[in-house]
Amino acid sequence: MAVKIKLQRMGKIRNAEYRVIVADARTRRSGKAIENIGIYQPKQEPSLIQIDSERAQYWLGVGAQPTEPVLALLKVTGDWQKFKGLPGAEGTLKVAEEKPSKLDLFNAALAEANNGPTIEAITEKKRKAKEEAEAKAAAEKAAEEAAAAEAAKAEEEAAKAEEADSAEESAE
C-alpha cells in the first residue's frame, strides 16, 4: 500500500488550517487518515508549524512519500534534513513571540489599580450634587461680591460726605 504524508484542510473559508496526516495515496484530500502527525496554520504570523518529528521520521523511514507542500514544511522544521542526513537539521522555523500570560496582565492591572484612580467615578447623583454645589457656591460668591460692592459704595459716599463736612468747617 502506497502511503503519503499530506495536508488535510480544516478551518473556515479564507482561514485555512491544515493537519499533516499520513494516509493511503488513493484517498481524497479530506479522506480518512492513518495518523495525524502535525498541524500547519499559514494565516498566523509567523506561520504555525507543529510536526511530531519522531512520527515523521518513522513514516519517512518506512517509505511514506511526502507531497510537495509537506516536503517544504519538513525542510522548514528540519525533519527532512535529519531523515536524509544533510546538514541544517535544526531547520529555519520562525517562532512567534510569547504572549504575556493572563496572570501577568491581571497582576499589572491590579498594581495600577492599587495606585488609586486618577479621577473619581461619576454617577448621575454625584454629578447633579456637584453641579448644585457649584451653582450654590457661585451664587454665594456673587452675593458676597455684591455686598462688597455696596459696602465700598457706602464707604465712598461716607468719605465724600466727610470731605464735604470738613470743607464746610474750614470755610467757616
From Swiss-Prot:
NCBIfam families: PRK14520.1, S16. Belongs to the bacterial ribosomal protein bS16 family. GO terms for biological process: translation. Pfam families: Ribosomal_S16 (PF00886). The keyword Ribonucleoprotein applies. This is Small ribosomal subunit protein bS16. Keywords: Ribonucleoprotein, Ribosomal protein. GO terms for molecular function: structural constituent of ribosome. Gene3D superfamilies: 3.30.1320.10. It comes from Corynebacterium aurimucosum (strain ATCC 700975 / DSM 44827 / CIP 107346 / CN-1) (Corynebacterium nigricans). Residues 125-172 are annotated as: Disordered. GO terms for cellular component: cytoplasm; small ribosomal subunit. Residues 129-144, 152-163 have a biased composition (Basic and acidic residues). The keyword Transmembrane helix does not apply.
